[in-house]
Amino acid sequence: MVEGKIVQCIGAVIDVEFPRESMPKIYDALILEGSELTLEVQQQLGDGVVRTICLGASDGLRRGVVVKNTGNPISVPVGKPTLGRIMDVLGRPIDEAGPIESENKRSIHQKAPAFDELSPSTELLETGIKVIDLICPFAKGGKVGLFGGAGVGKTVNMMELINNIAKEHGGYSVFAGVGERTREGNDFYHEMKDSNVLDKVALVYGQMNEPPGNRLRVALTGLTMAEHFRDEGLDVLFFVDNIYRFTLAGTEVSALLGRMPSAVGYQPTLAEEMGKLQERITSTKKGSITSVQAVYVPADDLTDPSPATTFGHLDATVVLSRDIASLGIYPAVDPLDSTSRQIDPNVIGEEHYSITRRVQQTLQRYKELRDIIAILGMDELSPEDKLSVARARKIQRFLSQPFHVAEVFTGSPGKYVPLKETIRGFKMIVDGECDHLPEQAFYMVGTIDEAFEKAKKIQ
């Protein structure tokens, strides 16, 4: 191993000098002598000096400390020994359950699969959440984004998806906690443990309190583990919470490295960094990666460069709205803003397609009439419009659903609604078969039959 020494420390940025003839390559991992600390090479400054980002706390570092070059990028353990374990960005266990006995290691920097290896799929993935299955259905092997501002329910929605898909799915899952709260990571671990699926999940955490280098690379660590399972011919679920923190860590690192910021202070390489990550999250002829990514939307502004860059990579976007959350309708998915590439009669079938479009038309009409209702009241509307409004309000309430993961808070048991039941329920509402029922009967129920039962109790 070639040795160098630290010549400058500025926060998480460490400059290391090596002999000129053996200068480390970009992304090489360097190790500090006598410590567990790893540095990753980001720039070559010339004359044997490289600029690195510290993957860990840089407290106590000083000039002259000896650094060794491993000659390879950061490699993490992959395969079955990682299942049921919690790891950090370097693949080291942080669950105090002993070392990870994995013979296979894989570099976190990999090329995206070649064009001829890709295998797009149109097979639907049922989630059991009415609004998602109806409005923005997921494809097996597709990429899904949960967009929302602070506190509208991204993490709860993701937990419910994990609960409904990962438990039914039976395959392996990888969860990458990128710059989120440690408490959520802890809750998730115990949730998995209690439902006996922990032995099928690998957990990788780089939480809010960690240096930017860790938060930037932890998504790649999780992805590398998911890629390994995919290349072994398995269908993997890959959950990321939160992609925005990945971008934010990139912004911090970019500023530390002295690059000029671009729009809104983001790094100039935003699109490239996002592309490098997203292009690897894909399905090949060997196996599939179905990914669900939470995306924080700063100040509820979907045109912010970070969420805007993410949009282009996704097959389905689930947009969570503060207005809908304020009505008490959860999940607070906006049925007019959320989209999916699967909404095509050739993929989901003519019936599902027409019901989805009719539901959206009814809700859109209600949205247009809201101003008139606010100014003139309901009495000024035509009979057709009154009917549209009544149905739209029923649809709005029927799009709500009690979640399994929120049982502790709400006290009402969670509901899993099969796709056929979802389509049947909304078909009955738009066909006018539920016009005689009060709208509160549709709030927080599972199937349409439960709404009829609830209506009897109300009346």
From Swiss-Prot:
InterPro entries: AAA+_ATPase, ATP-synt_VA_C, ATP_synth_F1_bsu, ATPase_a/bsu_AS, ATPase_alpha/beta_chains, ATPase_F1/V1/A1_a/bsu_N, ATPase_F1/V1/A1_a/bsu_N_sf, ATPase_F1/V1/A1_a/bsu_nucl-bd
Source species of the chain: Burkholderia mallei (strain NCTC 10229)
Record-linked SUPFAM superfamilies: C-terminal domain of alpha and beta subunits of F1 ATP synthase, N-terminal domain of alpha and beta subunits of F1 ATP synthase, P-loop containing nucleoside triphosphate hydrolases
Name of the protein in its database record: ATP synthase subunit beta
Cell compartments where the protein resides: Cell inner membrane
Function: Produces ATP from ADP in the presence of a proton gradient across the membrane. The catalytic sites are hosted primarily by the beta subunits.
SMART domains: AAA (SM00382)
Gene name of the encoded protein: atpD
Keyword annotations: ATP synthesis, ATP-binding, Cell inner membrane, Cell membrane, CF(1), Hydrogen ion transport, Ion transport, Membrane, Nucleotide-binding, Translocase, Transport
